[in-house]
Amino acid sequence: MGQKVNPTGIRLGYIKDWSSRWFADSKSYPVFLNNDLKVREFLKQKLKHASVSRIQINRLANNAQITIHTARPGIVIGKRGEDIDALRRDVSRFMGVPVQVSVEEIRKPELDAQLVAEGVAQQLEKRIMFRRAMKRAVQNTLRVGAEGIKISVAGRLNGAEIARTEWYREGRVPLHTFRADIDYGFAEAVTTYGVIGVKVWIFKGEVFEPVHTEPKTRSAVEA
């Protein structure tokens, strides 16, 4: 039985970039990695209402740069930048080095798999039927220009005694094509019956278009 690899991880270094960019020796590596995980967990909890999709961390010699990708930058920045200044101080104290925090707005949150997954999870927590939530997310994503989307939900759906997996797909989602720009997101819906996992794959198109060579004319071949 085949298992699906993480679409982002398998494309790292090809068409996807790492979420943490730094170099460390064997002693510092686990410290930096653990620190990155804690920083992301802290920011996700702090900005849970800001629709944060991903957090990029760049470590330099004596400081760090953090980029927050969010669909609601106003909540992150706050009035006159007060919230982001407080956030910068907290993260700097957390990491032990000066930190520069920047915010990038996600123009089309319907094309972001992580935000779509979190949106479906929030609807499931509000006791909305899972099929209705899935179809609504699929329609919104295809409307803004996606070439394909697949949504999978797993758990005690609608309070059933036996957990099961249901999925819905429209368009193309070529998981085996490395040049395919596939965004992947995962979220959990905490319901009274248990936790329901939500996975989303969004196909945005191919990064490298195939090269079409023009056929040689007869005169050029003879020459």
From Swiss-Prot:
CDD domains: KH-II_30S_S3
Keywords assigned by UniProt, alphabetized: Ribonucleoprotein, Ribosomal protein, RNA-binding, rRNA-binding
Record has Transmembrane helix as a keyword: no
Pfam families: KH_2 (PF07650), Ribosomal_S3_C (PF00189)
Gene3D superfamilies: 3.30.300.20, Ribosomal protein S3, C-terminal domain
GO BP annotations, alphabetical order: translation
UniProt KW rRNA-binding keyword: yes
Self-association state and partner proteins as the record states: Part of the 30S ribosomal subunit. Forms a tight complex with proteins S10 and S14.
Function comment: Binds the lower part of the 30S subunit head. Binds mRNA in the 70S ribosome, positioning it for translation.
UniProt name for this protein: Small ribosomal subunit protein uS3
Organism: Methylococcus capsulatus (strain ATCC 33009 / NCIMB 11132 / Bath)
Gene assigned in the entry: rpsC
